Amino acid sequence: DYEIEGNFRLYCTDVSLLLAMRDFGLKQAIVEGTLTGNTKGGLYESFVADALVKSGHALHFYRNETTKREIDFVIQGGGYVVPVEVKAGRAAANSLRAVMRSNEDIGLAYKVADANVGVSEDGVVTVPHYMAMYL
């Protein structure tokens, strides 16, 4: 696979400003812990994108049109391609695991989720959201 120059995603690099641009209902849902769906996922993706950029990473993403699989971020670590999947909750990272199975060159992958630090049998390293800045 290769990079397509005109294919990109935009993220707000200041999550506070992103929240300030939204209505009060969003802020209330965050405080009450009732935020759900694509809004919740998009907010967590923006937070992780901000952390990765501030850690010096260039942001790329992966999408396979045939299998409909997407990886939220692809960064470089130690000269290797490292996929990073962001989950707002504890959901499984099926796309991440499928990409790892189909590409033996990927030895390290991260799942950023509402979970503790851990490593699965297939080599996916899970880190909590607040540790995204350390990837």
Please place each PLM-identified region on the residue numbering:
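C-terminal helix of von Willebrand factor
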Residues: 127-135
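Hydrophobic/aromatic beta-strand patches that form the interior of the parallel beta-sheet core
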Residues: 11, 60, 84, 110-112, ...
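Accessory nucleic acid-recognition modules appended to NTPase machines
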Residues: 1-70, 74-76
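Catalytic cores of nucleic-acid endonucleases
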Residues: 88-127
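Short, glycine/charged-rich beta-strand-loop motifs at protein surfaces that mediate ligand recognition
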Residues: 36-37, 83-87
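Active-site beta-strand-loop-beta-strand hairpin of nuclease catalytic cores
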Residues: 75-83
